[in-house]
């Protein structure tokens, strides 16, 4: 065989083999997943379950490594979505309220009392009319949404006094995540909100730089917030964000269809397990917090009405600003649970 023919054959073989080689090279050795908290918390546990399922089901082809403490963004969870867009983060497992400063529409689930109980939340996250629209928003923002879990109902704790009614919030210095809407809710009741990452919040509570914080009681327990001077809790259930599992668009598009299916199904299974864990912890949290010597106030129905009235103006203003059509669909679904 002539040398020229040999070279032609080699070139043809290389050309035929190139796409397969390229596809193999597109898979990274590691995909970085950011979570605000480690697996000791239900939220972080959901991320761990997801990463393990993907690794096992792809035989290690897709290796997702969890980075808790929002360490990929120096502890500032509000920067996670921007960092994903920049290629610093590949996978997100977090509360969209943290990213609503970057993409306002992601915060639709955190309007005050929009999902007042688990029955309402379940109806919303299982509604195709709601979730198809929400997932479209996430895609347009730069990520492929896979599944939703639950971060848990957020409760107030403070070091000063029992908080029974909205007037009790006056003058309280409260740490909130970087959501302008959360800040407005607290301002509307006379509190003094300060935006702070979770990494900065704990020393601020310990030093007395802030008096209060709001988080699920599961977080209160896991982080031992009672040791940071927090003596009083009000279980008012004012906000319950989803836990969104999502992949950066360029990463998602680099995977073949079979692996995309595996990753999506793994996220759905992880979300299911994570929700079950959050619900179990929710059913036990008041008893466990009280056992630590913390005063826990559970509002009566009449008191809950006062809280809802106190946040109504903020709700109306932010409904218009965020995504009124989608929020209208959420309201319809929730109303259906009241009639059922």
Stretches with model-predicted labels:
Residues 125:
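An acidic, glycine-rich surface segment that forms the CoA-thioester-binding/catalytic face
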Residues 2-121, 129-130, 136-340:
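N-terminal secretory/targeting leader peptides
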């Amino acid at each position: 065989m002539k040398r020229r023919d040999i070279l032609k054959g080699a070139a043809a073989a290389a050309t035929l083999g190139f796409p397969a080689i390229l596809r193999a090279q597109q898979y990274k050795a590691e995909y970085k997943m950011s979570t605000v908290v480690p697996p000791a918390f239900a939220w972080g546990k959901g991320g761990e379950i997801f990463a393990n399922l993907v690794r096992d089901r792809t035989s290690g082809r897709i290796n997702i490594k969890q980075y808790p403490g929002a360490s990929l963004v120096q502890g500032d969870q509000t920067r996670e979505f921007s960092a994903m867009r920049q290629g610093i983060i590949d996978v997100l497992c977090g509360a969209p309220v943290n990213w609503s400063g970057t993409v306002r529409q992601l915060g639709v689930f955190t309007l005050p009392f929009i999902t007042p109980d688990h029955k309402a939340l379940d109806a919303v996250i299982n509604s195709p009319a709601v979730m198809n629209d929400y997932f479209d928003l996430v895609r347009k923002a730069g990520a492929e949404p896979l599944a939703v879990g639950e971060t848990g109902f957020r409760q107030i704790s403070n070091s000063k006094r029992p908080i029974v009614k909205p007037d009790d919030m006056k003058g309280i210095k409260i740490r909130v995540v970087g959501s302008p809407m959360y800040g407005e809710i607290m301002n509307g009741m006379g509190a003094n909100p300060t935006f702070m990452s979770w990494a900065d919040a704990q020393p601020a509570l310990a030093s007395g730089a802030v008096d209060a914080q709001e988080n699920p009681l599961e977080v209160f327990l896991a982080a031992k917030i009672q040791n940071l001077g927090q003596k009083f809790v009000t279980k008012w259930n004012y906000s319950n964000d989803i836990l969104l599992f999502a992949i950066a668009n360029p990463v998602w598009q680099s995977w073949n269809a079979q692996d995309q299916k595996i990753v999506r199904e793994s996220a759905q299974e992880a979300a299911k397990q994570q929700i079950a864990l959050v619900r179990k912890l929710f059913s036990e949290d008041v008893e466990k917090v009280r056992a630590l010597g913390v005063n826990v106030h559970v509002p009566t129905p009449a008191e809950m009405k006062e809280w809802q009235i106190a946040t109504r103006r903020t709700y109306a203003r932010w409904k218009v600003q965020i995504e009124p059509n989608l929020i209208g669909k959420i309201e319809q679904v929730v109303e259906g649970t009241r009639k059922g």
